[in-house]
From Swiss-Prot:
The chain crosses the membrane at residues 24-44. GO terms for biological process: antigen processing and presentation of exogenous peptide antigen via MHC class I; antigen processing and presentation of exogenous peptide antigen via MHC class II; cellular response to low-density lipoprotein particle stimulus; defense response to bacterium; Fc receptor mediated stimulatory signaling pathway; Fc-gamma receptor signaling pathway; immunoglobulin mediated immune response; innate immune response. The keyword Magnesium does not apply. This is High affinity immunoglobulin epsilon receptor subunit gamma. Residues 54-82 form the ITAM domain. The modification Phosphoserine is found at S69. The gene is FCER1G. Its main location: membrane.
Amino acid sequence: MIPAVVLLLLLLVEQAAALGEPQLCYILDAILFLYGIVLTLLYCRLKLQVRKAAIDSYEKSDGVYTGLSTRNQETYETLKHEKPPQ
């Protein structure tokens, strides 16, 4: 695909040399526009793949609290109040 693009650009350069100044700008603008569209599509595709991978990895785990267990001992213990000797 890359050699085809290079060949196309070389053909456009020969034609562009024969064109006037405004027409050359239009050709360059079209190339930049297509380049921007391709980059935008690749960026969106990458974002969707990363998001899908994150969702898949989240579904594989049991949840946020994986590995935690309940304690057998109560958190709060009652204090034994003893009267001081008199």
